[in-house]
Amino acid sequence: MSRLTSTFQVLRHANRKALIPFITAGDPEPGFTVPVMHAMVEAGADVIELGVPFSDPMADGPVIQKASERALVHHMSLGKTLDLVAEFRRADRTTPIVLMGYLNPVECMGYQRFVDRAKDAGVDGVLTVDMPPEEAGEFVPMLHRAGLDPIFLLAPNSSDARVQRMAALGRGYLYYVSLKGVTGASHLDLAEVESRIAHIRSLTDLPIGVGFGVKNAETAAAIGRFADAVVVGSALVEKIAAAQDRPEQARKDIVDLLAVMRRALDA
């Protein structure tokens, strides 16, 4: 059983919802990442999504695009991101780590080499934003054989057939994109999202996480009433951007926001 599956089972039995923060590896500089990952776990994170910096992050809004830019100034790469995961794993063997990024760096490294390195580093899941299930035929079986969970993005307009295909290929959880557009967008219609999640549940038994547009504890708590996990990204990355020259302040601001969200989810 994967760490992700085990984590969601434990949470389900405890009637709790997963809190999944996202940060970009190496933002604002590489030495910040691992300490803040540990701090996020202490603040109540159940899973961590770690973004792989990329020069053309088309699915990301301005906040996370700038995070990639800050990380790339320090020559961050997929390989260096995996090194950070391995460093995190030296002290934390239980918190699942999901790499979130684009296909190009994986293709440049080579599918098999990436899978081998990700497994060795202690990665648990791989979410490749621009790899639709129709094009995942070679990559996904490699992930399965290595015990890595492929995670797919569900859009509000995904057809039933597409949801079922992603559920058949995916492991760990499905990531429902609560808004049409890029990360960090606003105007979240919670009633519409809740209705959509209820329908998706009729098509798959995989846990469902909801992200894009989660800005505060109130929204996190509302999503937690019908989803299995709440993913928060841009709101945390904004804290890093606002205090990028003051790492201790950035870490405190991230921890404070996550702690409030954790309390709201558990209330």
From Swiss-Prot:
The catalytic residues are 49, 60
EC number(s) recorded for this UniProt protein = 4.2.1.20
Q: Name one GO cellular component term.
A: cytosol
- On whether NAD is a keyword of this UniProt record, the answer is no
Name the enzyme group at the top EC level: lyase
This protein's pathway: Amino-acid biosynthesis; L-tryptophan biosynthesis; L-tryptophan from chorismate: step 5/5
Gene3D superfamilies under this entry?
Aldolase class I
NCBIfam families linked: trpA (TIGR00262)
How does the record describe its quaternary structure?
A: Tetramer of two alpha and two beta chains.
This chain's function reads: The alpha subunit is responsible for the aldol cleavage of indoleglycerol phosphate to indole and glyceraldehyde 3-phosphate.
Official protein name in the record: Tryptophan synthase alpha chain
Give the species this sequence originates from.
Methylococcus capsulatus (strain ATCC 33009 / NCIMB 11132 / Bath)
Gene this protein is translated from: trpA
